[in-house]
């Protein structure tokens, strides 16, 4: 500092700052729920820009939301990864086109089978999709009902941890009236 200058020290003590009106009003994007200056990182920049133009044009002043799509590396990260038993490409398109129905228009059947997995066993259910039953909902119901793990592993297959075949023979017709007792086949135990 030179001889004639005086330093202005602003207090960093907690409390209100002069010239600022309280409570502070925060504005968030109605599409990505981030502050507007972060809309560029949401992956929905075009939708965020349209929302801001319509609802809060004053937010666009001084902001630069880029028009460029995400880079190839970012795009690959955003793609949903298929897990075990998931279909990709032509197989997924064919399953969607057929509506999950079995080929050939054969009789509608639900099959139950116990499979050994190491020292324990799992129950495999096939054929529920032929009755227009949502497999994710059914899997969640089985997991809650039997207090065990249950997952959709294929286009028309649910795997439940544990041997619950006998309980399923009663539960399926009770929960889904379109499936009768005669349409459920117990295939027994699968050999190793």
UniProtKB/Swiss-Prot annotation:
Occurrences of domain SUI1 (ranges): 117-176
One GO process term, biological-process aspect: translation reinitiation
Segments of this protein annotated with the region Disordered: 62-116
Biased composition (Low complexity): 87-99
GO molecular function, one term: translation initiation factor activity
InterPro entries per UniProt: DENR/SUI1_TIF, DENR_C, DENR_eukaryotes, DENR_N, SUI1, SUI1_dom_sf
Family annotation (Pfam families): DENR_N (PF21023), SUI1 (PF01253)
Family indicated by similarity: Belongs to the DENR family.
Protein name: Density-regulated protein homolog
């Amino acid at each position: 500092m030179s001889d004639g200058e005086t330093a202005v020290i602003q207090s960093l003590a907690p409390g209100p700052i002069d010239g600022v009106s309280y409570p502070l009003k925060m504005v968030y994007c109605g599409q990505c729920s981030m502050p507007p200056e972060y809309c560029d990182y949401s992956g929905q920049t075009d939708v965020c820009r349209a929302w801001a133009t319509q609802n809060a044009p004053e937010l666009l002043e001084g902001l630069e939301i880029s028009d460029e799509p995400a880079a190839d590396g970012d795009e690959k990260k955003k793609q949903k990864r298929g897990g075990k038993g998931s279909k990709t490409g032509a197989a997924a398109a064919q399953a969607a086109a057929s509506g999950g129905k079995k080929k050939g228009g054969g009789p509608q059947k639900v099959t139950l089978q116990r499979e050994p997995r190491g020292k324990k066993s799992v129950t495999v259910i096939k054929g529920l999709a032929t009755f227009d039953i949502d497999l994710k909902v059914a899997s969640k119901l089985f997991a809650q009902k039997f207090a065990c793990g249950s997952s959709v592993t294929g286009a028309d297959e649910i795997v439940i941890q544990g041997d619950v075949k006998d309980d399923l023979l009663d539960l399926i017709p009770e929960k889904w009236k379109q499936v009768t007792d005669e349409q459920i086949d117990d295939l027994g135990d699968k050999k190793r």
